[in-house]
Amino acid sequence: MSTIPFRKNYVFKNWAGIYSAKPERYFQPSSIDEVVELVKSARLAEKSLVTVGSGHSPSNMCVTDEWLVNLDRLDKVQKFVEYPELHYADVTVDAGMRLYQLNEFLGAKGYSIQNLGSISEQSVAGIISTGSHGSSPYHGLISSQYVNLTIVNGKGELKFLDAENDPEVFKAALLSVGKIGIIVSATIRVVPGFNIKSTQEVITFENLLKQWDTLWTSSEFIRVWWYPYTRKCVLWRGNKTTDAQNGPAKSWWGTKLGRFFYETLLWISTKIYAPLTPFVEKFVFNRQYGKLEKSSTGDVNVTDSISGFNMDCLFSQFVDEWGCPMDNGLEVLRSLDHSIAQAAINKEFYVHVPMEVRCSNTTLPSEPLDTSKRTNTSPGPVYGNVCRPFLDNTPSHCRFAPLENVTNSQLTLYINATIYRPFGCNTPIHKWFTLFENTMMVAGGKPHWAKNFLGSTTLAAGPVKKDTDYDDFEMRGMALKVEEWYGEDLKKFRKIRKEQDPDNVFLANKQWAIINGIIDPSELSD
């Protein structure tokens, strides 16, 4: 049995507050050796392990009543090596380090992470384990910046993985949903520090559609916040710069009063009278951005790169994010726009805002690109690896093109359907999320692994309940679609999972893995 100290009666709750767990034991190992010991002990005791970091996944994928492991004490920098002639550096860190801690270290060295998502609270291991991404026509999954990984597999073996050492296991571990092993260290490729110069425009929804074919490749970093009842969008575009910082844009809901007022309005519209929702959106939009359409000559801000990448996620929320081919984006947005409007007319359901619309380019060259002529503000990635993870949910048919030739045909469109939980109160999501998922599915989309996708009883595997026996927000599962979508890649992932974890040490919360096709029910002896 493990000699590592543990806590009993610990309650884990995810950031959104939707799910909680009271594990039998809660561990915080302080070294890689302790992680190895812990996995071996769990195997001998026939216990399962789940690793958690910041708990930002809004789903129940990390819920367990057995052993829970947190790597926050594995937060040291192991090595930092600069390659000035190639204009990058490689930093090797413990996998429990949070991104904001890594950002602080890199900033002091004059370097930056190349691309990030909307927050920096995740751990180095956690951010790649479910396929996290930023929003750029040139950059792909965050994992493409990782040069190598060291994991402890289910046999308690320490394994070093990269494109040359166990490349197939590497491709499984780059997006593992926690089922291949515990990532204990990683090497990340970083670039000389840069600021982001951004413009923020208010445009109509119709103008967004008119600009669709050229808009997404107009800046290195780009995202849209869609307000369907207001029929307006906020278009944010950013590029690297060495200009001096002048701070972020002002935010009404970034103030204590604005934030409280918005959450109160959401509570009233969800708990007392739902048809108020469109009016709440219009009021909040006008307070945050004003009534008039603004051009790109309006709000211009220069911030550090991390402030440019990150955004205020506001309140506890259900999030259902899917990615589909950008070429299908016009059809998707028109369909969703019509459905949202009709649902409001019929008082069937209402959506919350902003709906975040983003893109990525997960196409990969056959080999790493020449970086010898880059500058601090050169666009595009310096790849840590050119391996596509087996469980990458982005379109697999897109083909790599040099930056100057990138079009929508290389891109993945991401849409976030977000429903807030004002003051921690659950809000109905099933009607809206089901329609959203069906729309994205028809357009060739797949869900983000960490989010609150629902699926259906007809798509799940293993035992299912009657539809009426599920909670409104309860996941039904997507196993049959997952098998169809991922095909041979899923078969390879399952084979590697079984080889690396023959005793199912990392199969806590088996139900989540079964209903979503990560494992075949026949793999389990029980």
Swiss-Prot record:
Reaction catalysed by this enzyme: D-arabinono-1,4-lactone + O2 = dehydro-D-arabinono-1,4-lactone + H2O2 + H(+)
Catalytic class of the enzyme: oxidoreductase
Modified-residue entries (Pros-8alpha-FAD histidine), positions: 56
Any one Gene Ontology molecular-function term assigned to this protein's record: D-arabinono-1,4-lactone oxidase activity
Compartments, as annotated in UniProt: Mitochondrion membrane
Entry cofactors: FAD
Note: Present with 6190 molecules/cell in log phase SD medium.
Protein name in UniProt: D-arabinono-1,4-lactone oxidase
Species annotation: Saccharomyces cerevisiae (strain ATCC 204508 / S288c) (Baker's yeast)
